[in-house]
Amino acid sequence: MDPISNDSSEITYDYSDGTPNPDMPADGVYIPKMEPGDIAALIIYLAVFLVGVTGNALVVWVTAFEAKRTVNAIWFLNLAVADLLSCLALPILFTSIVKHNHWPFGDQACIVLPSLILLNMYSSILLLATISADRFLLVFKPIWCQKFRRPGLAWMACGVTWVLALLLTIPSFVFRRIHKDPYSDSILCNIDYSKGPFFIEKAIAILRLMVGFVLPLLTLNICYTFLLIRTWSRKATRSTKTLKVVMAVVTCFFVFWLPYQVTGVILAWLPRSSSTFQSVERLNSLCVSLAYINCCVNPIIYVMAGQGFHGRLRRSLPSIIRNVLSEDSLGRDSKSFTRSTMDTSTQKSQAV
């Protein structure tokens, strides 16, 4: 599925009804038209850019000062950077849709900029998985966390996730190119699988669906099921705001990426002559724009989570975000849980 144009498979211009181009009138004058989905995508892109750049830049600014000493700040700093990179590419994608998919920015920009949305998808879900593992260890392995949970280890984990995300984005870099539209003067930027094996498009679609959606969904569901059971069974951990924030972020990720993943699989598996394919293809820009909403919702979640009953209007946005993303009660509870565990084991050894 292509973040730029509605053509996400092999480039071909043969139409079943024998006409050179179904959108071209009989007099040969091609008048490009904008689909309703494209108009909706433009509105969403504009809103996401305004909110996403401002919000994520604020999160980066707040967490950058905390990242030297707190693990939570490192997690959310990297999430904000991934979202901010995607949001900064939006003006170019916006321009491409306004120009009816014409790409005036050159070959290198075609390779890099649209691929940022995939880099954001993979880096976000891998970072969310890492954050979830951190939450899991804090609850179930508090002694280990007291010894080894340090900012240095968190930075190493983030580095690994970024490398993996880049590796998973390689197919977009390899198969994306620009070409001239034979029916107009437009230059198009899209995915071309014609030079790869016949199965490459389906293989990439399956990889993207499994690694970027299904497997993380199953893993995070299992992880948070155990976390919620343990969290609500202990009074000391019932007010863990970071756990709730992470769960909200994870939920938004899967909700906004679901249309993109579903339509991507449909476009990869159905023949281009299928009426279903053509209908889904018209929704391409809209589904990509919905995925982009995920890039701006995290700062909103942080602010909403930090709106306490007292002093809502007196507190500034940076202080709200700093409070939400700080090392919360869960970290303190792990310390108390560690002490209680050690005390219990000491009592058992004395009894023996």
Curated annotation (Swiss-Prot):
Entry keyword annotation includes RNA-binding: no
Keywords: Cell membrane, Chemotaxis, Cytoplasmic vesicle, Disulfide bond, G-protein coupled receptor, Glycoprotein, Membrane, Phosphoprotein, Receptor, Sulfation, Transducer, Transmembrane, Transmembrane helix
Post-translational events: Sulfation plays a critical role in the association of C5aR with C5a, but no significant role in the ability of the receptor to transduce a signal and mobilize calcium in response to a small peptide agonist.
Matches recorded under SUPFAM superfamilies: Family A G protein-coupled receptor-like (SSF81321)
Annotated TM spans: 39-65, 71-94, 112-133, 155-175, 203-228, 245-267, 285-305
Cytoplasmic-facing ranges: 66-70, 134-154, 229-244, 306-352
Membrane protein topology class: Multi-pass membrane protein
Keyword Signal (UniProt): no
Main location: membrane
Ranges where the record places region Disordered: 1-20, 332-352
Modified residues (Sulfotyrosine): Y13, Y15
Disulfide cysteine pairs (residue numbers): C110-C189
Positions where Phosphoserine occurs in the chain: S316, S319, S326, S329, S334, S336, S340
Topological domain spans for side Extracellular: 1-38, 95-111, 176-202, 268-284
One GO term describing the cellular component: basolateral plasma membrane
Subcellular localization, as worded in the UniProt entry: Cell membrane; Cytoplasmic vesicle
MF annotations from Gene Ontology: complement component C5a binding; complement component C5a receptor activity; G protein-coupled receptor activity
Subunit and partners: Homodimer. May also form higher-order oligomers. Interacts (when phosphorylated) with ARRB1 and ARRB2; the interaction is associated with internalization of C5aR.
Summary of the function given for this chain in its UniProt record: Receptor for the chemotactic and inflammatory peptide anaphylatoxin C5a. The ligand interacts with at least two sites on the receptor: a high-affinity site on the extracellular N-terminus, and a second site in the transmembrane region which activates downstream signaling events. Receptor activation stimulates chemotaxis, granule enzyme release, intracellular calcium release and superoxide anion production.
Family per similarity comment: Belongs to the G-protein coupled receptor 1 family.
Protein name, UniProt field: C5a anaphylatoxin chemotactic receptor 1
Annotated source species: Rattus norvegicus
Gene expressing this chain: C5ar1
